Amino acid sequence: MQNFKHICVIGLGYIGLPTAATFAAHGVKVTGVDVNQHAVDLINQGKVHIVEPDLDALVRDVVAQGKLSAQIIPIEADAYIVAVPTPFKDDYQPDLKYIEAAAKAIAPYLSQDNLVILESTSPVGATEQMAAWLSEARPDLTFPQQAGEQADILIAHCPERVLPGKVLQELISNDRIVGGMTPRCSQASIDLYKVFVKGDCIETNARTAEMCKLTENSFRDVNIAFANELSIICDKLDINVWELIKLANRHPRVNILQPGPGVGGHCIAVDPWFIVSKTPEQARLIRTAREVNDAKPEWVIDQVKIKIAEFLQANPEKTIKDVTVACYGLAFKPDIDDLRESPALEITKKLAEQGINILAIEPNIKTLPQKLPNNVQLTDVEAGLEADIYVVLVKHKQFKNLCLNIKKVIDMCGV
């Protein structure tokens, strides 16, 4: 069993920082690395730059204990965990530039028997590509693609499987898929994660581990697309979709998900494209689901325009510049501050670009993203009640008991 006294986590975002803090809380010395100097400075003060329940207290404690520190360049360690973004390009092809940068950053510090784990959700083959970049940078060391079980450096893929808002609990309780490039790589990775993981660590190969995470999120995306398409059909047929789903789900083998304004975040809205990019002819259902979910924000915008037209018809003395729309929620899901790929943010931006005055109610952020026009004002729940039209885009807990005029509401999440 391999002993890991010091690990280095590359990328201190929504996955990297909780992972680093959890290892530190279980007695491992952790050095976190991030290119964001502001984030590094905050962490070293025992503070956090992201919203995740209980993370602030955990980071404060492990920094105070000297178990966690942060810096902008890597350091020699026993193991490296890469948790950097993996976006896609404009043509929906995966962009591995952050993985490449991480590989080149850690390469000078590698030594015999080091373990490198790619946690970033990645297209099939990304772990092998990372190994190739490392090998190119360190020809003095051997890697699994060259030396198999006798390699100097061990490499694996272990995708995160946590739910934002419950990250700290699920890091410990969830099962982990561990895909080494060789069985020895897998076993070393299991030894590392068993420092804190109480769920099962299930061994496979790197390519299957990569595809497993993509499959999980594509399954979710396809099922959400069904719910979103159903909501559009029900609107056309004048049927309450929330009541319909509740009734249909009373069938013992039916479990329809809840519709929404689209699909956001850096996983479900992105990962299916990694499958489509590799197998475009075969992934027809997965592509169609992505198209359905990507189109939902435009449908929401059309519903708002209809509501605005009705308002102006009832108030002929006013123009569109006199209309105020309250958008409740900007995050991609409830009770977090993550705006990545958020359909709510996209809807708010496009409505503002129509010249409509927007009141944005997002209790989990302090400032608006720069991409929003100047006619968007960040305000609180009470101030939003002064709007002419309400659009509920995210099911934040603060919106649970909203008392809104039903004639003025477009409810996209069943609040």
Model segments located where?
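Structural/interface elements that position substrates and couple domains in central-metabolism enzymes
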Residues: 1-415
